[in-house]
Amino acid sequence: MVPLSWSILLGVALFVIGAGGVLLRRNILIVLMSLELLLNSVNINFIAFGQYYDDFRGQIFAIFVIAITAAEVAVALGILVALVRNKSTLKVDDVTIMKG
C-alpha cells in the first residue's frame, strides 16, 4: 500500500502545476488541460483519504468529479470550436467578449 503522504505529495504537485498553467498560460486549450490537472489532483486526494480511512466515499466523490469534468470538457470544447471559427485564435487575451 502506498503511504498517504506520497499520495498527498502527488496531489499537491499536480495541483501546483495545474494552478501555474491556469494563471500563467494564455492559450485556452492549455488552460483547459491545466484545469483537468487541478481536478485530477483533487481526485487523487479523495481516493487517497478514502483508502486511508477505509471508506469508499472518496471513490464515489472521485467518480462524481470525473462525470462533472466530462460534461465541462464537452461544453468547453464546443465553445472553443465556435471561438476558433469566429475569431481564429486560441489566446485568452484576444477574446474579450462572447457576442457574435
From Swiss-Prot:
User: Carries keyword Transcription regulation?
Assistant: no
Q: Which reaction does it catalyse?
A: a quinone + NADH + 5 H(+)(in) = a quinol + NAD(+) + 4 H(+)(out)
What is the similarity comment for this entry?
Belongs to the complex I subunit 4L family.
Source organism:
Sinorhizobium medicae (strain WSM419)
Membrane topology listed for this record: Multi-pass membrane protein
User: Keywords for this entry?
Assistant: Cell inner membrane, Cell membrane, Membrane, NAD, Plasmid, Quinone, Translocase, Transmembrane, Transmembrane helix, Transport, Ubiquinone
Q: What does this protein do?
A: NDH-1 shuttles electrons from NADH, via FMN and iron-sulfur (Fe-S) centers, to quinones in the respiratory chain. The immediate electron acceptor for the enzyme in this species is believed to be ubiquinone. Couples the redox reaction to proton translocation (for every two electrons transferred, four hydrogen ions are translocated across the cytoplasmic membrane), and thus conserves the redox energy in a proton gradient.
Q: Which GO terms describe its cellular component?
A: NADH dehydrogenase complex; plasma membrane
Q: What is its EC number?
A: 7.1.1.-
Q: Quick one: which gene encodes this?
A: nuoK2
This one is known as: NADH-quinone oxidoreductase subunit K 2
Signal sequence, start to end? none
Query: Where is the protein found, in the record's own terms?
Result: Cell inner membrane
Pfam families documented for this protein? Oxidored_q2
Please name the GO terms of the biological process aspect recorded for this protein, alphabetically: ATP synthesis coupled electron transport
Q: Does the keyword ATP-binding apply?
A: no
Quaternary assembly: NDH-1 is composed of 14 different subunits. Subunits NuoA, H, J, K, L, M, N constitute the membrane sector of the complex.
* Enzyme class per UniProt: translocase
Give this protein's Gene Ontology molecular function annotations.
Answer: NADH:ubiquinone reductase (non-electrogenic) activity; quinone binding
Question: Where, by residue number, does the polypeptide cross the bilayer?
Answer: 4-24, 28-48, 60-80
Q: Which domain of life is it from?
A: Bacteria
